[in-house]
Each structure stands twice: as C-alpha cells, then as structure tokens.
C-alpha cells in the first residue's frame, strides 16, 4: 500500500483488524518507536501527518489500537509521513505586506511610547523585507482639546523613525474611538470638544431603538448638519485630513506615504456600529439597527413621505435584541418582514445612508490628498451568511440578503473615487467556524469570494487584512489562497496585505519564522520547506 501526498509516494505498511469507520475528529495515538505525535502549532487545527521512527520489521507488541466512536482497528505505520499539500507561490506576483503598529504607539500627550523598543522591532521587520507599516492617526489625540488646533508632533517623530529605516507608511485617518471592541488594548476617545457637544446634543451619536447612544463615532446623520461648533461633520473630517496633508508634505513628496486609508465608521470601517460589546453583544448575535438619532430618523421620515407611505417613517419593531438569532425574530426569519414591501423600503434606505456617507467622505479625501491613493475598509460580517436574510449584514448596513447583491453598489461607489477596498477576515475558514460555532451558520470563505469578486468586477484594487491574530501556517496559507487565487482566469490578486498586528507574540522566535516564511511567499519567493510541517525537516531512511 502507498499514500500519495504532495506528489510524493510514501510506502506505508498497514495491518488491519476488523473493518472500521475512522471519525474525522478521531485522534491517531501512535506509541511505537520514537513517537513524535500529531503535529500542531500555535493553536491551529492539527494537520493530518505523523512522524514515526523507521523500523526493519514490526512485532505484535507494536500493534496500536485506534479508538473510534463505533469500532476499533489495529494499524501499523512503518514510514515517516512529513509532507502535506501546500501550493508553491514561487514566481507569483508580489503582494506588498504591511504590519499594523500597536494601537497605542502614540499616547494622549502625542509622544511615541517606548521608542527604543519600537525601533528594535521595526529593524527586525525591515530585516525580513516587510514593505512598510500601518499607523492610526487618532482624531482624539491630534485635535483633542480645541477645534482646528492640531498636534502632530508625536506622529512626526514616529514617521521620521520609520523613514530612516526605509519602510513605507500606510496612514489611517481614524475618526473613531479606540477601546471596547475585540483586540482594543488602549482607550482613545473622540476629541474632548466633540464629547462636550454630545453632552448637550447626544443625537450626534448613533442610537439604537432603546435610545442607547454609541460614542464610538459620529452618526452619519450630521454629515451635513452644522452642529460641531459651526462646522458639519464632513467639514471637520476634511479640515483634519487637509492639515495632515500639509504637515507631512515631505513624506508624500518622497513617496514614503503611498496610501491613505480613510475611516468611515466604527473601527474605521464602513458599517453601522450594529454589534457593540459595550451594550452586551456577543458573537454570533444579529445586532441591532442604529438609526434612531433624530437626524437619521428625520431622513427616514422624509424618504417615507417621498415614497408615498409616511407611516413607513419608523424603524422595524420586531427585530428583537443584539443577541437574538434570525429565526427568533419576526423581521429576519425566513419569510419574515425583511422581504416585505416595508422591509425592502427600510433596508434600501438604511444601506443607501451608508453608501452616501462613504461617497461624501471619500470625495473629501480625494480633495485633501490629490494625487495619493486612498482606501477604505469594509468589515467582514460572516455570521448568518448561510441564512436567507443575512441578518447580521443587514443591521451593519449591507443589504445582502439571499436575493440581492449588497456589495456591488458599494464597490461601484469606491470605483467612483478610484478608492481601494480593504477587506477583513481573509484568514478565516468556513469549516473552522462551523466546528466552533455551528449555530452561527457562518461562511467567511463565501463572503470573501463575493466581496473580492464584486470589487474586481468593478475594476478597483482590493487590499486585505486579517480579522483576528494569526501566527500559524494554516491561517497564513488561507491568506495566500485569497491573496493569489489559483483558479482566477485573469490572474487577479490583492494589491497589498496588512498584518494585524505588531506585538510581543509575533516577535517570538517560532512565530516570527512562520511570519517570515509567509512574507516570502506573498512576495513570490521560494521557500525551502514547502510541504513540510513547521519545525520538521526532510529525513532520509537509513
């Protein structure tokens, strides 16, 4: 008997007892010779490979029982199995890789935090040919106390450090609060003077049906309302971006800053803050609509009157709570009100507000950064993707139910402004999600496929980043598959990838070796250990 793995035929001696069905979840407990066990790494799911000492012959004592739910069998493995299927990316297109710097790399006093340690880490990144880093420029730090008084001093010091090492800088215009979401390890609020306005006019914030105000970012209802000390939200965003462009002119002229990512909502993403942890949301809750501030409600009422049904100028009343399931609601269940005449009207309006906000802010960004590439981030709402309503996407503002394409119109808006689309969750596997949360009916792979193709069909650049920390080969291989699709007839690929994020765990020896290997493959370089498990090497039988 022989096993063919990664184009290599490996002889295996197997001694079987009674026929058996081996469960996919069954472990393979090898105890013969020099057992090394089933290889796992950094919390990833085990690869199906094992390493067993070579033997000239087997004895009855070497027989190893393999337990199964329904039956058992005896099996012998007489050869090392160290290969697994892994695609060779040598010679493929180079996809630049950037690394996000820590969220709190600049403190509230506009000083670089632990600059010597940071410099050492940046040198290490440069040594493995990372293309650059991503830096959040926080509105709450730079324009903290007084309108139109900007303090860029800490960022200037940081950018000079990065420039001296020959790294590029992706800059994020971060108009949102940091803190309270998954992965946030610092708390940076929006500017103090804006929060003072919010105390007397809380409708400047997104609001849910219970009247809870979300202070992560400003509601899109005030984009054109002069409620911020005589300025509209759009004017505030433009003035901030223009100040940055003037202050860092030399970095633009030297092409140190090749791209600006513009924050369009919570976490810098173009979405409603529909699943806030601060209000008790837990995965995989469907979230709630966030349109109950007076400005968005006035917009909804006006849209209903134009439609000729003024009684539609209200939010749905049967969507339940943040942690509900679609089938537990009258609105999102199969055949629910989401697909009624009113439901379609409401969802059209709700998603149009999102697209119009992106349209307006990206237009301002192109004015501020004329001649520089701009980008914006779209979140990967992959839970409940396998249901008809796609409830979690609907509450986030993506009208992507099973009978609609919710991402084509967004891609068309990006195309209008020649903006790149940055998408998350490219490292996630649908099978993993099904094993961990089968009730969520998630499909991150299907979502990534839909969004990437919507963007490519609109002829806009597509960048990406991982949604959760990733240190293992399996996650990196999934990113590579999405970055350079094997079956794409046009050879399309990501314009760049941004790794989340620089931290002590990444810098650990084995994790950094895996990252360096991933980086080479993203750059289209050959790696010597293709098809081998991490930490193993080819061995020759004696």
Swiss-Prot record:
Q: Name one GO biological process term.
A: polysaccharide catabolic process
Q: How does activity depend on pH?
A: Optimum pH is 6.
Keyword Plastid among record annotations:
yes
Q: Does the keyword Chloroplast apply?
A: yes
User: Which compartments does it reside in?
Assistant: Plastid, Chloroplast
Query: Which residues are listed for substrate binding in this entry?
Result: 136, 176, 184, 377, 382, 424, 466-467, 501
Annotated PROSITE patterns: BETA_AMYLASE_1 (PS00506)
- Could you say what a knockout of this gene produces? Normal growth rate and starch breakdown in leaves during the night.
- GO CC annotations, alphabetized: chloroplast; chloroplast stroma
In this protein, the active site sits at 269 (proton donor), 465 (proton acceptor)
Catalytic activity from the UniProt record: Hydrolysis of (1->4)-alpha-D-glucosidic linkages in polysaccharides so as to remove successive maltose units from the non-reducing ends of the chains
Q: Which family does it belong to?
A: Belongs to the glycosyl hydrolase 14 family.
This protein is called Beta-amylase 2, chloroplastic
């Amino acid at each position: 008997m022989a096993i063919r793995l990664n184009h290599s035929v490996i002889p295996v001696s197997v001694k079987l007892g009674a026929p058996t069905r081996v469960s996919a979840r069954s472990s393979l407990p090898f105890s013969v010779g020099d057992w090394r066990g089933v290889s796992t790494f950094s919390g990833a799911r085990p690869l199906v490979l094992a390493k067993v000492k070579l033997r000239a012959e087997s004895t009855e004592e070497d027989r190893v029982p393999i337990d199964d739910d329904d039956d058992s069998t005896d099996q012998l493995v007489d050869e090392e199995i160290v290969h697994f299927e892994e695609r060779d990316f040598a010679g493929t297109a180079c996809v630049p890789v950037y690394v996000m710097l820590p969220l709190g790399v600049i403190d509230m006093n506009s000083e670089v935090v632990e600059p010597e340690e940071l410099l050492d880490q940046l040198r290490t990144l440069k040594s493995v040919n990372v293309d650059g880093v991503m830096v959040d420029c926080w509105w709450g730090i730079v324009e903290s106390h007084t309108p139109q008084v900007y303090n860029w001093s800490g960022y200037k010091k940081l950018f000079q450090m990065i420039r001296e090492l020959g790294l590029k800088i992706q800059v994020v215009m971060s108009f949102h609060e940091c803190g309270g979401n998954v992965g946030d390890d610092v708390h940076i609020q929006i500017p103090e003077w804006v929060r003072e306005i919010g105390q007397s006019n809380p409708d400047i914030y997104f609001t849910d049906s219970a009247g809870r105000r979300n202070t992560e970012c400003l509601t899109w209802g005030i984009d054109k309302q002069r409620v911020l000390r005589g300025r509209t939200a759009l004017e505030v965003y433009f003035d901030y971006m223009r100040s940055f462009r003037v202050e860092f002119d030399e970095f633009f002229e030297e092409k140190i800053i090749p791209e600006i990512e513009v924050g369009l909502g919570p976490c810098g993403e173009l979405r409603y803050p529909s699943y806030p942890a601060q209000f008790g949301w837990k995965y995989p809750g469907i979230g709630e609509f966030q349109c109950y501030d007076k400005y968005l409600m006035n917009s909804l009422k006006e849209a209903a009157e134009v439609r000729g049904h003024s009684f539609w100028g209200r939010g749905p009343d049967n969507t339940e709570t943040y942690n509900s399931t679609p089938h537990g609601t009258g609105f999102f269940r199969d055949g629910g009100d989401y697909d009624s005449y009113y439901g379609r009207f409401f969802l059209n309006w709700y998603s149009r507000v999102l697209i119009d906000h992106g349209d307006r802010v990206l237009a301002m960004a192109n004015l501020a950064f004329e001649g520089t590439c701009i980008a914006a981030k779209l979140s990967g709402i992959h839970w409940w993707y396998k249901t008809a309503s796609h409830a979690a996407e609907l509450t986030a503002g993506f009208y992507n139910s099973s009978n609609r394409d919710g991402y084509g119109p967004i891609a068309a808006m990006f195309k209008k402004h020649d903006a790149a689309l940055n998408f998350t969750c490219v490292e996630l596997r649908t099978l993993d999600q099904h094993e961990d949360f089968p009730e969520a009916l998630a499909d991150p792979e299907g979502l990534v496929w839909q969004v990437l193709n919507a963007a490519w069909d609109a002829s806009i650049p597509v960048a990406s980043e991982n949604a959760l920390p990733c240190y293992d080969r399996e996650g990196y291989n999934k990113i590579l598959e999405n970055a350079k699709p094997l079956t794409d007839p046009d050879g399309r690929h990501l314009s760049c990838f941004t790794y989340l994020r620089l931290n002590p765990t990444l810098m650990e020896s084995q994790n950094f070796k895996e990252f360096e290997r991933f980086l080479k493959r993203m750059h289209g370089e050959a790696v010597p250990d293709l098809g081998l498990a991490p930490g193993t090497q080819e061995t020759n039988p004696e």
